[in-house]
Amino acid sequence: MERTLRKKRTGRVVSDKMDKTVVVAVETKVRHPLYGKTINKTTKFKVHDEKNEAKINDRVLIMETRPLSKDKRWRLVEIVEKAK
């Protein structure tokens, strides 16, 4: 599988307490099937951060990868925006 076919997501770092791992919350907008209201749905991913460079509230780009542990299937590509 080529790297260009892998899923990419953008989200915010909500936890950086683990070594070489950050938790990234990705928010998507979903319409309710019956009522039609737009709802914000948040999914949390454990992301591999080799250099421990992402900090809390950073906006990051993540990419799907091979399973690195029981829960980690994503890796950090770049930090889009640093936290203030």
UniProtKB/Swiss-Prot annotation:
GO terms for molecular function: rRNA binding; structural constituent of ribosome. SUPFAM superfamilies: Nucleic acid-binding proteins. Keywords: Ribonucleoprotein, Ribosomal protein, RNA-binding, rRNA-binding. It holds the Pfam family Ribosomal_S17. InterPro entries: NA-bd_OB-fold, Ribosomal_uS17, Ribosomal_uS17_bact/chlr. It comes from the Bacteria. Gene3D superfamilies: Nucleic acid-binding proteins. Signal peptide: none annotated. The keyword Transferase does not apply. Transmembrane segments: none annotated. One of its GO terms (cellular component) is cytosolic small ribosomal subunit. One of its GO terms (biological process) is translation. CDD domains: Ribosomal_uS17. HAMAP family: Ribosomal_uS17_B. Belongs to the universal ribosomal protein uS17 family. One of the primary rRNA binding proteins, it binds specifically to the 5'-end of 16S ribosomal RNA. NCBIfam families: PRK05610.1, uS17_bact. Part of the 30S ribosomal subunit. This is Small ribosomal subunit protein uS17. The gene is rpsQ.
